[in-house]
Amino acid sequence: MSERNLNIEKERYIFRKAKAEDLPAIAEIYSKIHEEEKKGSLYVGWLPGVYPTADTAETALKRQDLFACEEEGNVLASAIINQCQVDVYEEGDWTYCGSEEEVMVLHTLAVNPNATRRGLGSAFVKFYEEYAIQKGCSVLRMDTNERNTIARKLYRKLGYLEAGIVPCEFNGIPEVNLVLLEKKL
């Protein structure tokens, strides 16, 4: 699946694998999220210069698991979608079990703060679910910071169950209470 067109709220979004030319826009999205968090208008729990960074996106691009959402040629959101479960997932109280081949994971979903309240987060998660189905995966997993109440509310609304909260250092960020989430397709 290289490209998927979805019409959401009369807006045309294109979900696709990211390209090298998308990296500056994705890094800018990360920077804008960090800026909004510094202002106190958003809480995701990420740290500038630590996670996520331009290197986060570049590494995912090299692995070919970085995805972008664009509208009229502008990248509005990105995410990493793969079958890599991070170490702390071992501590999850998972309801849905599956072999590594049956589990798809969503990481680092980032929506440009200037494009919020347009359904992009929901649309990206729906794209992730469709992508998982096409890849033969029936178990979905993801995580978020306990304090990221906006994401937690969205994921609950989309049918995801919380499978535990694990205190850890996550991607170089100390003292994170990581919420593990899951859904069965």
Predicted regions and their residues:
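Conserved N-terminal entry element of GNAT/NAT acetyltransferase domains
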Residues: 1-24
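Conserved GNAT-fold acetyl-CoA-binding loop/helix
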Residues: 27, 34-56
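A short helix-loop-beta-strand connector motif used in the catalytic cores of GNAT acetyltransferases and
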Residues: 54-68, 84-88, 105
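Conserved acyl-donor/pantetheine-binding loop and adjacent beta-alpha core of acyl/acetyltransferases
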Residues: 80-108, 115-116, 169-173
